[in-house]
Amino acid sequence: MTMEPNPTSDHILDWLEGSVSFFPSFLDDPYNNGYIHEYEIWNQNQDISNQYQIDANTNSSNATNSTTNIVAASTTTSTTSLEPNSFNNIPFSDLPKKRNAEDELSLKKQPQNQKNKRLKSRPMNESDNGDAALEGTVVRKSGGNKKGAAKANGSNSNNGNNKDGRWAEQLLNPCAVAITGGNLNRVQHLLYVLHELASTTGDANHRLAAHGLRALTHHLSSSSSSTPSGTITFASTEPRFFQKSLLKFYEFSPWFSFPNNIANASILQVLAEEPNNLRTLHILDIGVSHGVQWPTFLEALSRRPGGPPPLVRLTVVNASSSTENDQNMETPFSIGPCGDTFSSGLLGYAQSLNVNLQIKKLDNHPLQTLNAKSVDTSSDETLIVCAQFRLHHLNHNNPDERSEFLKVLRGMEPKGVILSENNMECCCSSCGDFATGFSRRVEYLWRFLDSTSSAFKNRDSDERKMMEGEAAKALTNQREMNERREKWCERMKEAGFAGEVFGEDAIDGGRALLRKYDNNWEMKVEENSTSVELWWKSQPVSFCSLWKLDKQPE
């Protein structure tokens, strides 16, 4: 599918380059502020406008409030109609800075009486591009750097469902609105502020600002097919580190382990309902687990009354690598590093459990071309489809690849289908403009980053950076076409499936698993018990549902 171009965003780089001479180098590396100090706009000796008062004598315990207030000041002061060069009047010293040794030395040399000034934003009554003007408040700047400020405030998880504390979104979303509306001055201003606050080792807000800034500059850049520099993803890592990091993530977060647990229990439930225990079990794996899901399933299968089936076939549909270098078309969490092979280890483990396992991989096989022949299914086996976090990559407009694929699955006559997906609104260009879609992507990534803040206590963890870098693909992937659980259920019914009630083992197992994790995670079971949802801080993250063939389709 080819995405519809956005005439405004397609040409935005042209007018950015024509207006600001240093934007090309800034877009190439938004975190290298070496370029910035070469330009007069960043002269720290500029006179401070009378509308500001400065107070730099604040300790790091107020870092979170400091940043929030700076956001309020910067969004407020940028809501008025700006002249072409009006951003030159915004002093660099008003922004929280990434200090180096020189900066710290210069601060120490400042006269003591200059540390007691106070910075306030003037009150504004108008908003621009749909962004509500924020009431100006006292801006308190941390005496330390962002990293220290973040440590002083812990993981900032208390801001998970508090819009006022989620300051990164208050910068990213208005910037996307400004890009959509073609407001050059506002884009400039917000990109500068984001550049100063972005950090991959800060709290969830700082990390969201970092990934969001990369995504926005990536959107503005002409080289949109390349992966933004500095991001660690699955494909950029070494296979052993990749597998180790996945296992660690499953241990610390239920983001994937919870739906996998429900799916495994559902497969056993479907298998137990089959009258013939001597049939081959064939699992069609369309997921993102990279093999991590199956060891616990094989163990449970070996303990099953009557023993495991005589043969277990696992057909893994790997994500197509034809777009491996095009982040705009790559489903998050779907493509591992080159050389990653979990088959040998899984086969050895199955042998130790006396489970006769066969693994077949379908590489470079798009879901749109999947059929019974390519899967090699037969009527004398028990086929169960496990589709997790991959089907939202299929187009749901014209052509409606999503509904067609579900009908293909129906034609294979599986005994059960487990569907797990993100529980959120669509972000594609057909369901809204760039600003609308971007705000939904940011919301998704915030929940991921906020939850990993609680899971990974080490801010410099490479494992956490890899998982978050992979999740951040959602900000740039043009095929992130999610839908709410209700819409997915409607599609499944239209394709000829009927919802199946989860058994007690699946429900109780899911609840028991969540007790291992942060208490902000919760599980919600729908009234008819055919769908289970995973929530983080009272907000939906994903759902898992169980389906069988509707014997009497309407």
From Swiss-Prot:
Has keyword Ligase? no
Q: Which InterPro entries match?
A: TF_GRAS (IPR005202)
Kindly state which keywords UniProt assigns to this record, in alphabetical order: Nodulation, Nucleus, Transcription, Transcription regulation
Q: Where is the sequence biased in composition, kind Low complexity?
A: 150-162
Where in or outside the cell? Nucleus
Induction line: Not induced after treatment with Sinorhizobium meliloti.
What is the name of the protein in this document? Protein NODULATION SIGNALING PATHWAY 1
Q: GO molecular function of the protein, one example? A: sequence-specific DNA binding
Q: Name one Pfam family in it.
A: GRAS
**What does this chain do?**
Transcriptional regulator essential for Nod-factor-induced gene expression. Acts downstream of calcium spiking. May be a target of DMI3, a calcium/calmodulin-dependent protein kinase (CCaMK). Is essential for Nod factor-elicited expression of ERN1. Transcription factor involved in the control of strigolactone biosynthesis in roots through the activation of the beta-carotene isomerase D27, which participates in a pathway leading to biosynthesis of strigolactones.
Chain intervals for the UniProt region annotation (SAW) = 471-548
Q: Quick one: where's region VHIID?
A: 246-315
Q: Which family does the UniProt entry place this protein in?
A: Belongs to the GRAS family.
Q: Where are the residues of the annotated region Leucine repeat I (LRI)?
A: 166-227
Give the domain of life.
Eukaryota
For this entry, list what GO says about its biological process: nodulation; regulation of DNA-templated transcription; response to symbiotic fungus
- Organism of this sequence: Medicago truncatula
